[in-house]
Curated annotation (Swiss-Prot):
GO cellular component, one term: microvillus
Intrachain S-S bonds: C26-C246, C103-C288, C143-C182
Gene Ontology MF: a single term: cargo receptor ligand activity
Keyword terms: Cobalt, Cobalt transport, Disulfide bond, Glycoprotein, Ion transport, Phosphoprotein, Secreted, Signal, Transport
Organism the protein comes from: Rattus norvegicus (Rat)
Tissue expression notes: Gastric mucosa.
Residue positions where Phosphoserine is found in the record: S191
Annotated binding of cob(II)alamin, by residue: 171, 222, 270, 365-370, 386-395
UniProt-listed Pfam families: Cobalamin_bind
InterPro entries, per database record: Cbl-bd_prot (IPR002157), Cobalamin_Transport (IPR051588)
Record-given protein name: Cobalamin binding intrinsic factor
Length: 417
């Protein structure tokens, strides 16, 4: 390629990467900004040397302009030292974007991810939508580094999405939208025009699917998937059939924040960019310098009003009816804990009172997950896991963050995905 063509190509890529954002975003009212500042501080102060480094948190910190420089440095160094062989494609993609947002060279991580994705194929048509989440993140990260080399992978991904009949989860659809929007904006000069048509068609299908999950109060899917969905709907070049009211969504999210719904650092990491008017497409444009905002003090932002101290009763059931598992059971216990206690306290009290409720946990980027109850453990090969429900509704938070109410019936159900 001639030097002039190469230069023009890169200029057009840069321009495309920063333009085409539709005016479908909204901002936090100034008088509500202290609540957002408080969330950001809570997320940043959760970073410790002993925890697994979470690239999603570093991305959110950098997009929002970090307050805690020490936490930023710690996460950056931890992610730079991470072994690519230990990471899934999705984790590797997030690590690349996190390091890029910290103005660090991801090094060989990019070529490793590129090689992994060149051999990517869906496990089978009709596979669960979650199997597209990691590849979508990978295409997003690779697109931001070299869209020309990513084009064949993205084309194969888009065609596969068009063949997929089952609806996507909001999270998967949102990340796929961000990935294909990046490719749509950065189609290399001289490429066939039908590539843009393909990405546009795939985006239309996905954003229409997301728009069908918009509830009357503006929440998209659930409150924890709304952050990624807001990013997707604010940048997609394809308008969804169902109109999205960004201000209504923002109003409801702020109301949920005031009620203390966002306490998990990972949940904050996914909503914070939208609260700051940013998306993952902004990662390459993050500037790094010595000037940073002065962090607000703890007295500068409000906190949710604590509940009164009293005991509540929680009805807790553990259930395993899966065929092929040796031990079948359905056992219920009533547990008394202090009002405002998290679900983990209920599990601990049930375990103390009855050995059948013995459980084990595993630490993930979303916090603790229950991996085993009554000696029945999750199994990736068999696609089994413990799902927690309130009545018949799956919980949107983990056991270390969900706060049950008086006489709520919580069920831990061993099931398959």
């Amino acid at each position: 390629m001639a030097w002039l063509s190469f230069y023009l190509l890169n200029v057009l890529w840069a321009v495309a990467g920063t333009s085409t954002r539709a005016q479908r975003s909204c901002s936090v009212p100034p008088d509500q900004q202290p609540w957002v500042n408080g969330l950001q501080l809570l997320m940043e102060n959760s970073v410790t040397e002993s925890d697994l480094p979470n690239p999603s948190i570093l991305i959110a910190m950098n997009l929002a302009s970090t307050y805690n420089l020490e936490a930023q440095k710690l996460l950056t160094y931890q992610l730079m030292a991470s072994d690519s062989a230990d990471l899934t494609n999705g984790q590797l993609a997030l690590t690349i974007m996190a390091l890029t947002s910290s103005c660090r060279d991801p090094g060989s991580k990019v070529s490793i991810l590129q090689k992994n994705m060149e051999s990517w194929t869906p496990s089978n048509l009709g596979a669960e939508s979650s199997s597209f989440y990691g590849p979508a993140l990978a295409i997003l990260a690779l697109c931001q580094k070299n869209s020309e080399a990513t084009l064949p992978i993205a084309v194969r991904f888009a065609k596969t999405l068009m063949m997929e009949s089952s609806p996507f989860s909001v999270d998967t659809g949102a990340v796929a939208t961000l990935a294909l929007t990046c490719m749509y904006n950065r189609i290399p000069v001289g490429s066939q025009e039908n590539y843009r048509d393909l990405f546009g068609q795939a985006l239309k299908v996905i954003v229409d699917n997301i728009s069908l999950r918009i509830k009357a109060d503006g929440i998209i899917g659930d409150i924890y998937s709304t952050g990624l969905a807001m990013q997707a709907l604010s940048v997609t070049p394809e308008q969804p059939t169902k109109e999205w009211d960004c201000e209504k969504t923002m109003y409801t999210i702020l109301k949920e924040i005031k009620q203390g719904k966002f306490q998990n650092p990972m949940s904050i990491a996914q909503i914070l960019p939208s609260l700051k008017g940013k998306t993952y497409l902004d990662v390459p444009q993050v500037t790094c310098g010595p000037d940073h905002e002065v962090p607000p003090t703890l007295t500068d932002y409000p906190t949710p009003v604590p509940t009164s101290i009293s005991n509540i009763t929680v009805i807790y059931t553990i259930n395993n009816q899966l065929r092929g598992v040796d031990l079948l059971f359905n056992v219920t216990i009533e547990v008394s804990v202090k009002s405002g206690s998290v679900l983990l306290a209920v599990l601990e009290e049930a375990q103390r009172r009855n050995h059948m409720f013995k459980f084990e946990t595993t630490m993930t980027s979303w916090g603790l997950i229950v991996s085993s109850i009554n000696n029945i453990a999750e199994n990736v090969k068999h696609k089994t896991y413990w799902e927690f429900l309130s009545g018949k509704t799956p919980l949107g938070e983990g056991v270390a963050y969900y706060i049950p109410f008086n006489y709520e019936h919580i069920t831990a159900n061993f099931t398959q995905y």
